[in-house]
């Protein structure tokens, strides 16, 4: 049994090959770019401001998210660990791209 469900709010766009597992909430109108992997323990780092803001288990509303990595030190050395990066906020141009995908699905057109 899942301790905490996956919650995907309204008008979220999920790109190809994304993985979202238990304990993650994706808030309304967020955009997950291709290959984003989110677990309850995945660092979600907002890099849009002067200083990074770190989230775990939640993608804020209207965030545009892509896969990324950060450096973590281990006994054997420094290695890159996967994370998700918030690189911006959903804009009108993003809405147009996602509405095109909706239209293609509605009319069963493969692209």
Where in this protein do the model-derived segments appear?
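Structural signal for interior beta-strand "rungs" in well-ordered beta-sheet cores
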Residues: 1-73
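Terminal amphipathic alpha-helical/low-complexity segments used for targeting or macromolecular assembly
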Residues: 56, 61-63, 67-111
């Amino acid at each position: 049994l899942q301790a905490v469900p996956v919650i995907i709010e309204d008008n979220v766009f999920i790109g190809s090959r994304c993985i979202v597992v238990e304990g993650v909430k994706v808030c309304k109108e967020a955009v997950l770019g291709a290959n984003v992997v989110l677990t309850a323990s995945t660092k979600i780092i907002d890099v849009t401001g002067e200083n990074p803001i770190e989230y775990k288990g939640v993608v804020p509303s209207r965030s545009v998210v892509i896969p990324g990595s950060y450096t973590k030190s281990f006994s054997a050395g420094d290695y890159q660990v996967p994370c998700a990066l918030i690189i911006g906020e959903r804009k009108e141009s993003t809405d147009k791209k996602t509405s095109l995908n909706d239209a293609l699905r509605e009319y069963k057109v493969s692209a």
